[in-house]
Amino acid sequence: HTRWATHGKVTKENTHPFTSRDDNFAVVHNGIISNYRPLKAQLQKEGFKFSSETDTEVLAHLLEKFYKRSRNVENAFVKMLSLIEGTYAIALISSYHPEQIFCAKKESPLMLGIGDEIKFIGSDFNAFIDHTKNAVILDDREYAIISRDAYVVKDLLSKEEITKPITKIEWDSETSKKGGYPHYMLKEIYEQPQTISNALDLEESGLDEIVDLFAKSKSSYLLGVGTTFYVAKYGKYVFSKLAQEFFPSISSDEFMALANVNKQSLFFCASQSGETFDTLSALKHAKSKGAQTAAVVNVMGSSIARLVDKVVLQGSGPEICVISTKAALSQMVILTVLAMKLAVKKKAITTKTYNQHMLSLRELPGIIQGILNERSGFIHRLAHKYSGTRNWLYLGRGVYYPIALESALKMKEVAYVHAEGMPGGFLKHGTLAMIDDDVSSIVFVPPPEDKDLYEATMHSIEEIRARSGFVLGIHFSEQGKNSDLYSEELILPKVPPLTAPLIQLVIGQLFAYFTATSLKRNVDKPRSLAKSVTVA
């Protein structure tokens, strides 16, 4: 079990598992026990001593307390579960039943791995994929008891057995390994040509059903948090550009404060894991108000995939690195296709234009593969040269704004370097005051054919250079054109405006990765971050 600190610092004393006072119970836990303080106070009054600052330790002492009353581990476990509030995935072992593991969940992922003579508990399929491809996914308010050769799932309220379907895991352990790459992040960046192809080969009928939801809704919203919020912001731009529809993008953690939910609303979310707490909570609230819900997720059988009315399984394969790359780019491609389909349905574009756009998307994997093969070395050298830079501004206009945001986030997450993504127009409203020798800028320049955005972006660059600021320009113009405006430039092959921002995102990913390796960061497991954020 790997603990992600929510209550108490990262210390040995706060490390799982926690044992009861009599050492007959040991517990590990994901989530947050929201009422642990009054429970802890009551236990302390009864003479229980606590050695940590965590909420989890309460569980071990409660188990000891209730076992002494009933002399039955299962009854003690159920009684404990009835008292605690919040979110949890809990696993328990007891000296009274050394051949069994007890587990339960509420709003935190938990699944069983079912082998012939071995059983597993995990919060993700990858925990046991080397041993079995058969899984049972627990739902909220269920608990399970497993042993080497048997398992049983029960309803928490009635304690009656529940028959659960077996879920077949579609990938194998080899796809979850590094395959010769130094880090999962680099491997997953290099897998993006394939994940884009997978996204473009999704079943048309499933996409069309979601397009119908967009077409029928009176108000549609795009949800995500962190990287997927920037995916949603990207979607906002492509739906506006292609389908001439404005769908607000909302960060899932701000959903309650912003969204106007009713039965005519549609809430479409993106989530790599399908377990993101903030997004899951937002969708549950939307459904409680009668709204339609849909999602693009990467993990089959995940909580979001099972909750929403319509789901797209993006088929990107397991993403192991905490930093999302291939899943995010795939989701952007899927949102682009959905926007194109809605545009045709509304007659905002012709079928001919749709086919031209689809051809551009089909060419994207080959173009990205070429960039990975031919430009990675240059990007590596560039990142290493400027790895000492402590402050970056990432600038983009229009659809390049979410690309700037996501690229800056990658720099923060993996390299621990301060980076801000912002629209180019922000410069003259305050940010120009920051331009000096300690602040450098990366600018995502659109193709010249995208005339208005291109000219506005070049004006932003001129504003920075007029103040002697450093500019790394990532652009599609020929060698030598406007080169005097760039301190450094990275020239990309000419592509249509539709796919240009997607290509630039790959550059942002690589630049962050190579900066992180130059700084000797823990690339696949950055400090203080978790792959699937299942707590509030």
PLM features: residue spans?
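Glycine-rich oxoanion-binding loops at beta->alpha junctions
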Residues: 1-13, 197-212, 236-276, 418-434
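Acidic/histidine-rich
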Residues: 84-118, 387-413, 444-445, 451-453, ...
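Generic C-terminus detector
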Residues: 485, 491-536
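Conserved phosphate/anionic-ligand binding catalytic regions in large, soluble enzymes, centered on
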Residues: 30-34, 103-112, 181-185, 229-235, ...
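Conserved short alpha-helical segments that host acidic/polar catalytic motifs at enzyme active sites
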Residues: 1-183, 187-219, 230, 351, ...
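Short, glycine-/Ser/Thr-/acidic-enriched flexible segments
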Residues: 4-6, 23, 32-34, 38, ...
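Active-site phosphate/pyrophosphate-binding segments
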Residues: 185, 191-221, 289, 310-442, ...
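Glycine-rich phosphate-binding loops that contact phosphosugars or nucleotide phosphates
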Residues: 215-363, 397, 444-493, 511, ...
